[in-house]
């Protein structure tokens, strides 16, 4: 008997998609189907965890420049 898995369609930039694919490569528990360069189907019950992991990863990699001190 076939089983169905509830999924959510995610459309994002290729850079974000590559992070999601990397996160999934550890346990293969997030992505149901990789559709194209900007689209994935992910497990519905993993969406909140995925958002949190993406936020953490982006905080690690994105560091805005600190404002320069005024040198009078």
From Swiss-Prot:
Lineage, highest ranks first: Eukaryota, Fungi, Dikarya, Ascomycota, Pezizomycotina
Location(s) in or outside the cell: Nucleus
UniProt cross-references to SMART domains, sorted A to Z: Tbf5
UniProt protein name: General transcription and DNA repair factor IIH subunit rtf-1
InterPro entries (alphabetical): TFB5-like_sf (IPR035935), TFIIH_TTDA/Tfb5 (IPR009400)
Subunit structure comment from the entry: Component of the 7-subunit TFIIH core complex composed of XPB/rad25, XPD/dnr-10, tcf-30/SSL1, tcf-29/TFB1, tcf-11/TFB2, tcf-14/TFB4 and rtf-1/TFB5, which is active in NER. The core complex associates with the 3-subunit CTD-kinase module TFIIK composed of div-66/cyclin H, prk-3/KIN28 and rtf-2/TFB3 to form the 10-subunit holoenzyme (holo-TFIIH) active in transcription.
Known function: Component of the general transcription and DNA repair factor IIH (TFIIH) core complex, which is involved in general and transcription-coupled nucleotide excision repair (NER) of damaged DNA and, when complexed to TFIIK, in RNA transcription by RNA polymerase II. In NER, TFIIH acts by opening DNA around the lesion to allow the excision of the damaged oligonucleotide and its replacement by a new DNA fragment. In transcription, TFIIH has an essential role in transcription initiation.
Pfam assignment, any one: Tfb5
Organism this protein belongs to: Neurospora crassa (strain ATCC 24698 / 74-OR23-1A / CBS 708.71 / DSM 1257 / FGSC 987)
Primary location recorded for the protein, binned into one broad class: nucleus
């Amino acid at each position: 008997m076939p089983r169905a898995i509830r999924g959510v369609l995610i459309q994002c930039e290729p850079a974000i998609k590559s992070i999601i694919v990397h996160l999934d490569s550890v346990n293969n528990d997030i992505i149901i189907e990789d559709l194209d360069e900007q689209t994935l189907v992910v497990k519905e019950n993993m969406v909140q965890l995925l958002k949190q992991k993406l936020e953490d990863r982006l905080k690690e990699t994105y560091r805005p420049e600190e404002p320069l001190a005024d040198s009078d």
